[in-house]
Amino acid sequence: MKKGIHPEIKKTKIVCACGAEYETNSTKEDIHVEVCSRCHPFYTGKQRKATKGGRIERFNKKYGLSEE
């Protein structure tokens, strides 16, 4: 590797909005994030299913038709 062209790597503290702190190496000093693996719904199991439905399902729901 060429000397003098690469950014300096330093210890970085990542702080989440929920209060969780992680330490890693990066070119930045501190990083603040809104979600992490401790508070994100996917990892905590509190996720909701977003079922928008297709065009046919919406039509059937709107006009009271059932699939029999």
Swiss-Prot record:
Role this protein plays: Binds the 23S rRNA.
Complex and partners: Part of the 50S ribosomal subunit.
Binding site for Zn(2+): 16, 18, 36, 39
Protein name: Large ribosomal subunit protein bL31
Highest taxon in the source lineage: Bacteria
Keywords: Metal-binding, Ribonucleoprotein, Ribosomal protein, RNA-binding, rRNA-binding, Zinc
Keyword Zinc annotated: yes
Organism expressing this protein natively: Halothermothrix orenii (strain H 168 / OCM 544 / DSM 9562)
CC cofactor note: Binds 1 zinc ion per subunit.
